[in-house]
């Protein structure tokens, strides 16, 4: 048995979430080698928003690695939203501010607390940019996805696998106090993993109603709806309503509030108008009425330290036809290496669902072929990794 470090979320105090660093274990089961990672919603009370969409912050006693995680997270949030992080010094006294500090946990209050300086804590076990974005999203007012008032439509909670002291972490938010601005997304960076707070090794505490999403929950990849709800909550899209030229976005894209002539694009789509395959590795595969086979791979780039390398491919066919794909990972040893709740070491996402914005079911564990039929065309196929070279055998055709 290999032992790794992961994070858990412990709800403490008022509107504060702590992600406590603890060990987790990768073990074998009939589902595969599943990692154990203990680790959105917005308040209707707008006083928790940061004035002028600006968060003053300064960095305290953290390592250079954490500083890089914070820098990358801020760059990502500022690229997708109108939120601005203003770097100030520790003597800042013109209002509320955020201090990035290591308090031995991954934690943040929810929204602006109006107490002067509030802490966002990141420690060495808070993994990369994904966790930094998670905590900064808490700081600007975003709660956990699985706490939404409509959660029970999407999850089954297995209370028998949760200690009584941990059950408050699964309480629902009041719809009177908290608003759901976007659809429920299992792949949100704000969603718990399937085994969060489990009191038994290799036992789930929550199961998606659609079981194919069990590996998707617990993602370290911020998705389209994560940024979209920030933009709605902070009314970022208002800047584009009066714009002279507005991008005509395809495939579910929305004009970027920082530049209304280009689009924020869902994963798997790129270009200024979301009508192109994203730049970088990957290829466009043209389907015929006969099965074709192709190996699709992603190799980690050291330039993507603290995050992931992505390769985006498209499968295209005639507009009036349905696409069929069959895929499976080529190496069982790599499968065992990357298999985890959250697929945070690598995996694949085939965007076959009709909503191009939502996270589809990701795979990093199954050792049998997956078979999909979809009218989505072109069909995005996203491979990603945080280290290992991941390769899938792909068969495809149209019918």
From Swiss-Prot:
The entry's keywords: Disulfide bond, EGF-like domain, Glycoprotein, Hydrolase, Metal-binding, Metalloprotease, Protease, Secreted, Signal, Zinc, Zymogen
Subcellular location, record wording: Secreted
Cofactor annotation comment: Binds 1 zinc ion per subunit.
Cellular component GO terms, alphabetical: extracellular region
Entry comment describing in which tissues the protein is expressed: Expressed in pharyngeal muscles, pharyngeal-intestinal valve, rectal gland cells and arcade cells.
CDD domains documented for this protein: ZnMc_astacin_like (cd04280)
Name of protein: Zinc metalloproteinase nas-25
Natural source organism: Caenorhabditis elegans
Encoding gene (name): nas-25
């Amino acid at each position: 048995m290999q032992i790794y470090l992961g994070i858990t979320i412990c709800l403490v105090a008022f509107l504060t979430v702590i992600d406590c660093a603890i060990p987790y274990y990768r073990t074998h089961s009939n589902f595969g080698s599943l990692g154990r990672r203990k680790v959105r919603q917005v308040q209707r009370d707008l006083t928790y928003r940061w004035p002028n969409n600006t968060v003053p912050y300064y960095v305290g006693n953290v390592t250079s690695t954490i500083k890089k995680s914070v820098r990358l997270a801020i760059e990502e949030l500022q690229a997708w939203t109108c939120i601005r992080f203003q770097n100030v010094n520790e003597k800042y006294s013109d209002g509320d501010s955020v201090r990035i500090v290591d308090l031995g946990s991954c934690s943040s209050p929810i929204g602006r607390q109006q107490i002067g300086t509030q802490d966002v804590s990141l420690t060495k076990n808070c993994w990369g940019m994904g966790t930094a974005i998670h905590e900064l999203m808490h700081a600007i007012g975003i709660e956990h996805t699985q706490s939404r008032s409509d959660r029970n439509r999407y999850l089954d909670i297995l209370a028998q696998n949760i200690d009584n002291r941990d059950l408050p972490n699964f309480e629902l938010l009041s719809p009177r106090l908290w608003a759901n601005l976007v659809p429920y997304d299992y792949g949100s960076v704000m969603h718990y993993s399937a085994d969060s707070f489990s009191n038994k090794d290799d036992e789930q505490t929550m199961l998606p109603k659609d079981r194919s999403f069990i590996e998707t929950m617990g993602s370290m990849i911020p998705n389209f709806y994560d940024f979209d709800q920030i933009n709605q909550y902070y009314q970022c899209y208002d800047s584009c309503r009066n714009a002279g030229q507005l991008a005509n976005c395809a495939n579910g894209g929305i004009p970027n509030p920082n530049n209304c002539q280009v689009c924020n694009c869902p994963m798997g789509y790129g270009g200024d108008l979301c009508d192109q395959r994203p730049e970088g590795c990957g290829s466009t595969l043209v389907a015929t009425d006969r099965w074709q086979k192709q190996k699709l791979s992603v190799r980690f780039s050291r330039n993507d330290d603290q995050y992931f390398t992505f390769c985006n491919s498209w499968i295209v066919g005639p507009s009036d036809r349905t696409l069929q794909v069959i895929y499976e990972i080529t190496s069982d040893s790599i499968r065992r290496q990357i298999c985890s709740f959250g697929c945070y070491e690598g995996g694949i996402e085939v965007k076959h669902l009709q909503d191009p914005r939502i996270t589809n079911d990701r795979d990093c564990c199954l050792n049998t072929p997956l078979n999909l039929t979809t009218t989505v065309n072109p069909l995005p196929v996203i491979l990603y990794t945080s280290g290992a070279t991941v390769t899938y055998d792909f068969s495809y055709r149209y019918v």
